[in-house]
């Protein structure tokens, strides 16, 4: 595991770059970025440049902030809890979150927090839970805009046919996370 740092300026938005090389069933999860503002985590994302640029710009604009290097208690706690999660010793997180997005996106992300560890829901099922069964595409779009992956478990949303679809970290990473949370684990 390699930890590399990054942070914020006009407000105090800290970004911390983390490399988790997790070997699970011969697969890897790659560099992730963590960021916080006002002692709340606002970013835990995959280092996929095109996706990250969009999310970074949205967060910077809404929070009127820019990045600079550093670390905080929130980042340290998040790293510890993610390490426990990847080791199979944590099923929930108690990190304070700052959800940065539209009201609709925040509604979707808050509902994602209700999906239990080891369980999945379809986009159609999620849209029904939110009381808007015709909003499947809008809900999928909000799910894809989630800036706090893993802690806000967008990876637990799957297609109605139970197939893995759409994930900011890529489908191989989504499969690794779902396998990690599966009750059928071999270790």
PLM feature spans:
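Pre-recognition alpha-helix immediately N-terminal to the DNA-recognition helix
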Residues: 107-111, 138, 176
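…primarily DNA-binding HTH/wHTH and HhH modules…
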Residues: 160-187
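Basic nucleic-acid-binding alpha-helical/helix-turn surface characteristic of O6-alkylguanine DNA
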Residues: 4-133, 184-187
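Major-groove recognition helix of helix-turn-helix-like DNA-binding domains
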Residues: 139-144
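Terminal helix-turn-helix DNA-binding modules in bacterial transcription factors
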Residues: 145-149
């Amino acid at each position: 595991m390699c930890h590399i740092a990054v942070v914020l300026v006009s407000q105090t938005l800290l970004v911390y770059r983390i490399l988790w090389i997790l070997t699970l069933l011969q697969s890897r999860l790659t560099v992730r970025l963590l960021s916080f503002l006002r002692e709340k985590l606002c970013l835990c994302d995959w280092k996929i440049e095109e996706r990250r640029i969009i999310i970074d710009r949205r967060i910077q604009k809404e929070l009127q902030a820019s990045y600079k290097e550093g670390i905080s208690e929130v980042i340290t706690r998040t790293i510890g809890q993610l390490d426990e999660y990847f080791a199979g010793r944590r099923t929930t997180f108690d990190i304070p979150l700052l959800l940065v997005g539209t009201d609709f996106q925040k509604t979707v992300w808050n509902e994602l927090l209700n999906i239990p560890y080891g369980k999945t829901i379809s986009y159609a099922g999620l849209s029904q839970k939110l009381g808007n069964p015709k909003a499947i595409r809008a809900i999928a779009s909000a799910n894809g805009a989630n800036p706090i992956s893993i802690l806000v478990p967008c990876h637990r949303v799957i297609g109605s046919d139970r197939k893995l679809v759409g994930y900011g970290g890529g489908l191989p990473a989504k499969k690794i996370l779902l396998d990690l949370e599966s009750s059928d684990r071999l270790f």
